[in-house]
Amino acid sequence: MTQIKPEVKRTEELRQLLQQASYAYYVLDTPIMEDSVYDQLYRELQQLEIQYPELTAPDSPTQRVGERPATQFTSVRHNIPLYSLENAFNIDELQGWDQRWRRQVPKIDSVEYVTELKIDGSALALTYQDGILVRGTTRGDGVMGEDITQNVRTIRSIPLRLNFEGLEILERVEVRGEAFLPLEVFKQINEERQKAGEQLFANPRNAAAGTLRQLDSRIVAKRRLAFFGYTLHIPGRDDTSIANTQWEALELLEKMGFQVNPNHKLCASIAEVAKYYEYWDTERLNLPYMTDGVVVKLNSFKLQEQLGFTQKFPRWAIALKYPAEEAPTRVENIAVNVGRTGALTPLAEMRPVQLAGTTVSRATLHNSDRIAQLDIRIGDTVIVRKAGEIIPEVVRVLKELRPAETEPFVMPTHCPVCDQAVVRESGEAVTRCVNASCAAILKGSIEHWVSRDALDIKGLGEKLVHQLVDKVLVHSVADLYELTAEKLCALERMGQKSAEKLVDAIAQSKNQPWSRVLYGLGIRHVGSVNAQLLTQKYFTVEQLATAKQSDIEGIYGIGAEIAQSVYQWFRIDANQRLIERLQAEGLQLTAPEETKAFGDGNQIFAGKTFVVTGTLPTLKRDEAKALIQKAGGKVTDSVSKKTDYLVVGEDAGSKLEKALSLGITQLSEAQLLEMLNE
């Protein structure tokens, strides 16, 4: 019987534990573990996935910006994704971030940074129509959030009407900020809960999150949440039309009636940012609310737009957290892993050491630059730290304790899996195997293809993928669709019934939408969110494959790095052949509106009344109306109690406000097209 590798077993255990804890906390509002325990398990999982990149699954808690919305509230799509921030844990990492973004914008003279205290609460997105608060939503997973407008209205520091005195009157404004519980209020709430025999809240952040998701807004009102605004957007317009910088945006928020954290500061250099961070390390303990770090943003909106986003983070901002526990240990070996993108990641295998109640024995060394910077060698005594209290990281080498016989570590010149020469491209820190036939890359690409957020092929797990590659049954993801039950039965522990079931599951994956196929291709930097953004713009693979790089970069949320990666991917002959094979196999490389919406006249909207308002991302309003009518729906010009759906674009106007007051369901263009495809 084949033994499951300890790291595989532990990774799966951690995912299940964290998913159970997230469900209990976010959906049931009944935490089953302490926040610190969740953080510890999360960081352990994160470290395992860093050490074993091939174990990273799209449905892992580490791949989420937040949690999926519960069903008790209406799910709504954020007009602009609500991203989380990349973390740094010391000044060196802050400087590293500063150097990274500067490499993307080399011709820049001076730059300003805005530093803000990182409030430990819950992120909210607020929508104002003609100055009136019409919607408040949670972060959710960054793309979809929950409509908690009734609860948001109870927070006294959130204005129900914006103050436009002396300002341009804006038709639509979106404000982002943090809802939190002041420490004194938190203390009073727990005292009351103790008297009532109720379970106490673990900390102010949990209390704030649980309060916001109360179905009874009267309870929310009693808990006296507070709110600090920290940014704003003007849908349908360039944000620079009202503010050119983050500093100006904060000033504008104050003028509009929002409470803004008074401790923000404009800094002229990273050195000044570092001083701000060091000052608040101790001073924050005197604040009337919880804060766990400092948020650093580039002040210029123009520069922010140039830098764009990764799948999860803006490149122009970072959260600088406060330091964690450190301890000495000995490096016993330096191993090198190969991920699905071919990246070679060095890992320090260390004598086990206790940090924050857990045993640490491995730590990522990131790349050869980091190894050279540390001058780390096998046999060295090092200081290992748990960044963010959990992620193990080697922070320095105690060279005075170095044994005489040690030698500098050199990254391999050939892939440790396929033995082909590796490359390091100019300007990159990562060494890569570029052999498309490398077993490690192929296994990783297939595991990614079959994962839940991609083609979601049930029954095709890691062990089976490895068998398929090792026995040379597949050379690419397209080969999966040529597998037969007879071929599969030759594999270890694969019977006829299981083989037939797997063949059927593979065939069913041909029905997955274009956005999932694009994500499954594993193009560098293209996550599931980016794939959705791309397929909302480009309805067919041909449109995307022939798009200009500058046009791809113009999509909100798709920065230069992603655009370049997508553009270059479609110019590789092997990738073009893969697309041709997938098309021949019948996979969906076309968005629903190109295939079914104009197709068989399915009357799925029969008896339903629609109103279309605002500017849609890709469809003209008449085109949207035609699609609805072809599916049996009725389209009217005004919102009433008889309206079933409001299809909303940018600059929706008063129709949206009326629809919200009547409780009418709103649909984005993407949601409309998804319904047409069902």
Curated annotation (Swiss-Prot):
Q: Which gene encodes it?
A: ligA
What class does this enzyme belong to in the EC scheme? ligase
Q: Which GO terms describe its cellular component?
A: cytosol
Query: InterPro entries annotated for this entry?
Result: BRCT_dom, BRCT_dom_sf, DisA/LigA_HHH, DNA_ligase, DNA_ligase_AS, DNA_ligase_CS, DNAligase_adenylation, DNAligase_N
Give GO MF terms, alphabetically.
DNA binding; DNA ligase (NAD+) activity; metal ion binding
Q: Which residues bind Zn(2+)?
A: C415, C418, C433, C438
Q: Which PANTHER family match?
A: CHROMOSOME TRANSMISSION FIDELITY FACTOR 18 (PTHR23389), DNA LIGASE (PTHR23389:SF9)
Domain BRCT span(s) in chain numbering:
600-678
| Active-site residue list | K118 (n6-amp-lysine intermediate)
Which cofactors is this protein said to need?
Mg(2+); Mn(2+)
NCBIfam families associated with the record:
dnlj, PRK07956.1
UniProt record similarity statement: Belongs to the NAD-dependent DNA ligase family. LigA subfamily.
Family annotation (SUPFAM superfamilies): BRCT domain (SSF52113), DNA ligase/mRNA capping enzyme, catalytic domain (SSF56091), Nucleic acid-binding proteins (SSF50249), RuvA domain 2-like (SSF47781)
The source organism is Nostoc punctiforme (strain ATCC 29133 / PCC 73102)
Residues annotated to bind NAD(+) = D35, S36, V37, Y38, D39, S84, L85, E116, R139, E178, K297, K321
Keywords attached to this entry: DNA damage, DNA repair, DNA replication, Ligase, Magnesium, Manganese, Metal-binding, NAD, Zinc
Query: Per its UniProt record, what HAMAP family does this chain match?
Result: DNA_ligase_A (MF_01588)
Q: What is its EC number?
A: 6.5.1.2
Q: What is this protein called?
A: DNA ligase
One of the Pfam families matching this protein, by short name = BRCT
Q: Which reaction does it catalyse?
A: NAD(+) + (deoxyribonucleotide)n-3'-hydroxyl + 5'-phospho-(deoxyribonucleotide)m = (deoxyribonucleotide)n+m + AMP + beta-nicotinamide D-nucleotide
Q: What is the top-level taxon of the source organism?
A: Bacteria
Instruction: Write out the GO biological process terms.
Output: DNA repair; DNA replication
This molecule's function is given as: DNA ligase that catalyzes the formation of phosphodiester linkages between 5'-phosphoryl and 3'-hydroxyl groups in double-stranded DNA using NAD as a coenzyme and as the energy source for the reaction. It is essential for DNA replication and repair of damaged DNA.
